[in-house]
Curated annotation (Swiss-Prot):
It comes from Coccidioides immitis (strain RS). Component of the SRB8-11 complex. The SRB8-11 complex is a regulatory module of the Mediator complex which is itself involved in regulation of basal and activated RNA polymerase II-dependent transcription. The SRB8-11 complex may be involved in the transcriptional repression of a subset of genes regulated by Mediator. It may inhibit the association of the Mediator complex with RNA polymerase II to form the holoenzyme complex. The SRB8-11 complex phosphorylates the C-terminal domain (CTD) of the largest subunit of RNA polymerase II. Residues 1-12, 29-39 have a biased composition (Polar residues). Belongs to the protein kinase superfamily. CMGC Ser/Thr protein kinase family. CDC2/CDKX subfamily. This is Serine/threonine-protein kinase SSN3. It is an enzyme of class 2 (transferase). The keyword Acetylation does not apply.
């Protein structure tokens, strides 16, 4: 069973992927589509090349539960808490089972209250929590995590999501233990297609995710990919404030686009596509392609130039050139880039792009070939990767264009279940009975500003210890 392929784009337009409104989520259904039904709709200028079964099947033919804000519902009367999953600056996440006719498993996110000074004061929800709740309430797509309901109880806010058994960080880690073995090429293709399909939907709804990374890409036990954690997502159509003024730091450092590293005050959905390119490379190599060290803010909360991260990108892609990126010289941190290029011992930075060599070494070391069981992403895979990791955000491929790329439209059809044909088994998500404080009325307070404190470095280390 395979996904249909979207037709070639008639033009780039803006990075909103041709969004003209919020009424028609652009994802493929069966051989026909209904514009008035968002669960089966498609953008009006898209048609199908191949007839396939509806994406609705990825929801197991179950209609989404009606969303509700429940202020009088008692959490523990409706859900049985199984255990603790993870924590972040926002709060904690727990696994739960439905009670009394509410079947299935759920992930419950409990938000910490904001704090003033050292004493916890219930000053309201953080901007991040409000954004996530409001966006998840409106969004509905098979490749975006589904919010079931939001519960307010004892001054705490709980978001109840569908439960997903895996995420890409867990899957990548599994393929490095006990020894490295490649993720099969058909699985990589399916994961990437579903990720781009969900991203196309978000962008068509004028939503920028701004924190795509393996840990935030969820996968169900039936191989359906869901984009999760919309805490840094932002509606970019006619924003009240500039994107930079609202959040000065977005996207986890290893997945941060060069325009962000160079201090862009205005940016587009292209930052999400750069992150997808980084995720694509990581699925193939089983390690981050640009693994830099993050420079922290000083006491004045000044955003530093991320020199080391920029260096990691240059070592593979070469120095960005004004001739190929016309807006480069207008970037606030362009003088810092010039200083890097002219510093003593910087000769190696002036070499041409090394991405193609990196790609072929990656395929060889991973055992990817046309005759191997894992298959190979081939030259089409490299072309797509190079278009995702394009320096100039105006030239970077969009989600819509990427879905029409030959990597997806030729060769083996894209499997709707990314685990299709995979003979191995991934371990279930770790659920701990320790540190399970969802029954308490409060949590240590926090204020979320920019990215979570538990960056990928610490999170990956923590996940590795737990698995």
């Amino acid at each position: 069973m395979s996904f249909s392929n979207l037709p070639p784009s008639s033009g780039r337009g803006s990075h909103a992927d041709g969004a003209s409104g919020r009424s028609m989520p652009p994802f493929p259904g069966s051989s026909s589509f209904t514009a008035n039904n968002p669960s089966k709709g498609i953008h009006p200028n898209l048609t199908l090349k191949r007839s396939v079964q509806s994406f609705d099947e990825s929801l197991d033919n179950k209609k989404p539960l009606p969303f509700s804000y429940a202020s009088k519902v008692k959490l523990r009367e409706k859900y049985l808490i199984v255990g603790f999953i993870s924590s972040g600056t926002y709060g904690r996440v727990y696994k739960a089972k439905g009670r009394d006719g509410v079947g299935g498993d759920f992930a419950i996110k409990k938000f910490k209250p904001d704090k003033e000074g050292e004493k916890v004061e219930y000053t309201g929800l953080s901007q991040s929590a409000i954004r996530e709740i409001s966006l998840c309430t409106e969004l509905n797509h098979p490749n975006v995590v589904r919010l079931v309901e939001t519960i307010l109880e004892d001054k705490c806010v709980y978001m109840v999501f569908e439960y997903t058994e895996h995420d890409l960080l867990q899957i990548i880690h599994h393929h490095t233990q006990p020894q490295r073995h490649a993720i099969p090429a058909p699985m990589v293709k399916s994961i990437l297609f579903q990720l781009l399909n969900g991203l196309l939907y978000l962008h068509s709804q004028w939503v920028m995710h701004r924190d795509l990374k393996p840990a935030n890409i969820l996968v169900t036990s039936k191989g359906a990919v869901r984009i999760g954690d919309l805490g840094l997502a932002r509606v970019f159509k006619k924003p009240l404030n500039s994107l930079f003024s609202g959040d000065k730091v977005v996207v986890t450092i290893w997945y941060r686009a060069p325009e962000l590293l160079l201090g862009a005050r205005h940016y587009t959905t292209a930052v999400d596509l750069w992150a997808v390119g980084c995720i694509f490379a990581e699925l193939l190599s089983l390690r981050p392609i640009f693994k830099g060290e993050e420079a922290k803010m000083d006491s004045k909360k000044t955003v530093p130039f991320q020199r080391n991260q920029m260096l990691k990108i240059i070592e593979i892609l070469g120095l960005p050139k004004k001739e190929k990126w016309p807006g480069l010289s207008s970037m606030p941190e362009f003088p810092q880039l010039q200083a890097m290029a002219m510093a003593p011992g910087s000769g190696h930075l002036h070499k041409p792009s090394n991405l193609e060599h990196w790609y072929h070494v990656c395929l060889k070391s991973g055992g990817y070939s046309g005759s191997s069981p894992a298959g190979s992403p081939g030259k089409e895979g490299f072309d797509l990767l190079s278009r995702l990791l394009e320096y100039d955000p105006e030239k970077r491929i969009s989600a819509k264009e990427a879905l029409n790329h030959p990597y997806f439209t030729t060769g083996t059809p894209v499997a709707k279940n990314c685990f299709e044909g995979f003979e191995g088994k991934y371990p279930n998500r770790r659920v701990s009975q320790d540190d399970n404080d969802i029954r308490s009325g409060s949590l240590p307070g926090t204020k979320r500003s920019g990215l979570p404190d538990d960056t990928l470095t610490s999170r990956a280390a923590k996940r590795a210890r737990e698995m």
